[in-house]
Amino acid sequence: ETEVMPVYEMYKVGDDPYWLDGINLLESATGIRAAVIAHYNNAQGGTHDTRFCFAGERRMKMLEELLPGDTAILGIDEHTGISFNLDEKSAEVFGKGVITFKKGNQMKTYENKSVLSFDEFLEF
């Protein structure tokens, strides 16, 4: 299963970072193994770091270390989306922000109207 971040438990309850088992929809449809994180660029925290869906940088680094080595992070900024065309095996980014694909020490961002093949993700 692809991992899911328990946002409420970490942000509101104060639990230490951990992953839950997800339903693996992205990988089963596209072959792309990634934990999807919405609100990747959140800035509503004022003096608190709420990037990475309210996890903040410190907890996000801890979460990354807990991911299996073959799992990437697909970060989706606020007011941004990504559409997957299963027939053409491609994805298109839309909206005001970017999507971030990160695996290990490698990271790449894609902005509005970027079109990528599934292979670009798989070769990452």
Language-model regions, residue ranges each:
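Glycine-rich, charged/polar anion/phosphate-binding loops
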Residues: Y18-G22, R59-M60, E78
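A short, acidic, amphipathic alpha-helical segment used as a generic capping/interface helix at domain edges
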Residues: R58-D70
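A conserved C-terminal secondary-structure "cap"
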Residues: N85-F124
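A structural signal for short, well-ordered beta-strand segments and their strand-loop junctions
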Residues: A35, I73-I76
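Solvent-exposed alpha-helices and their adjacent loops that cap or buttress functional pockets
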Residues: L25-A29, E65-L67, L74-G75
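Glycine-rich phosphate- or other oxyanion-binding loops that anchor nucleotides, phosphorylated ligands
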Residues: C53
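Short beta-strand scaffold segments in enzyme catalytic cores
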Residues: T80-F84
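Class I SAM-dependent methyltransferase SAM-binding "motif I" and its flanking Rossmann-like core
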Residues: E1-D49
